[in-house]
């Protein structure tokens, strides 16, 4: 019997507001524990919450960008459960009347696009953070308690781990473009839970779902789903039954492990939050927010293809990150070849960003500095290979490319007399390659060019080197 997977994703994104959802405490990441708290976010008796208007605005902004229907009337609810990081013993969230619903994202799949439905987007407060240090107990940092979140719940329209990955990449891109969240998974401002079940192909009844947690990257989501789908199919094929539970992804072992039985909605005893008035979003306010929406990733991709002549692949990669797209556009509007700019962004720049785990705005290279480097190559001051060395130095030090070239003596050897002397020396030292070239083996010329580059530590002008080698070899 063949099985298919049914996958739904729940994404929590912290909103980029300066203050918390129900009080004036700062949302700044990385402060000393319990320094951004007050009686409201600590849940002390007698305190009352006041809803931050910016939270509603950002949630509506995300909802509009994700093609949702925005509710004119919604309310907050209490979700009751006990956990040390939840000071009030309930979380203020939304239950039956979410702020946004019935949206969608379109992702690229083999042979076209696929629409993934978004069931709902609701606003809620974050919990604190448990710190497990030593064996005597756990500590709680309440700085995060009350930080505003949106929870984006997809429909179970996702069929494969690859589709889940593509959905998350697209969703992150849209949230970054709308500037409602910075989506930094390493700081916990974007968190993903997945629900997955399997069923025989051709049936419509859903199987028993498993929730997966501890997913620290989109690749981890993909790997965990791949493992869990295989595990569930194996259980069913062996005549077993799937137990509804929450499982944890163990990155080191590459497996999912049982965590706890899954709660149902009734376990939380939801009821309307009595201390907050309902949320009213007028059509006028909706339209005001809609007018502030920026150009979205898909529209920007199409424009980059037509305006800058980029191949579709380049445009897709560059526009997947708003920061990368902005950097590219600043370069491309001041440099003669947008394609060369995209090659650098997708090549050396992307490699160093991946190696260091940094974002493009966290490194000291500006668009003007990259253009200056590219012009040094255009003007034959340095070669393309030396440019990569210079760029790496720029990446880590923020130094100007011209200064690096002068300090390290990296200027290209373009003096014909000096280069001809080196070319003759290389020809003399490599008689076999000379013989091969004269027999028609063009590869031998490449070897000789490489030897000249080695001799000059990469500083020989490649075009002039080629020309002089051909001249000397034809004698």
Swiss-Prot record:
Reactions that this protein is recorded to catalyse: L-glutamyl-tRNA(Gln) + L-glutamine + ATP + H2O = L-glutaminyl-tRNA(Gln) + L-glutamate + ADP + phosphate + H(+); L-aspartyl-tRNA(Asn) + L-glutamine + ATP + H2O = L-asparaginyl-tRNA(Asn) + L-glutamate + ADP + phosphate + 2 H(+)
Enzyme class: ligase
Enzyme Commission number: 6.3.5.-
One biological process term in Gene Ontology: translation
SMART domains according to UniProt: GatB_Yqey (SM00845)
Key words, A-Z: ATP-binding, Ligase, Nucleotide-binding, Protein biosynthesis
Signal peptide (UniProt feature, chain positions): none
Subunit structure: Heterotrimer of A, B and C subunits.
Family per similarity comment: Belongs to the GatB/GatE family. GatB subfamily.
Record PANTHER family: GLUTAMYL-TRNA GLN AMIDOTRANSFERASE SUBUNIT B MITOCHONDRIAL AND PROKARYOTIC PET112-RELATED, GLUTAMYL-TRNA(GLN) AMIDOTRANSFERASE SUBUNIT B, MITOCHONDRIAL
NCBIfam families: gatB (TIGR00133), PRK05477.1-2 (NF004012), PRK05477.1-4 (NF004014), PRK05477.1-5 (NF004015)
Name assigned to this protein: Aspartyl/glutamyl-tRNA(Asn/Gln) amidotransferase subunit B
Gene designation per UniProt: gatB
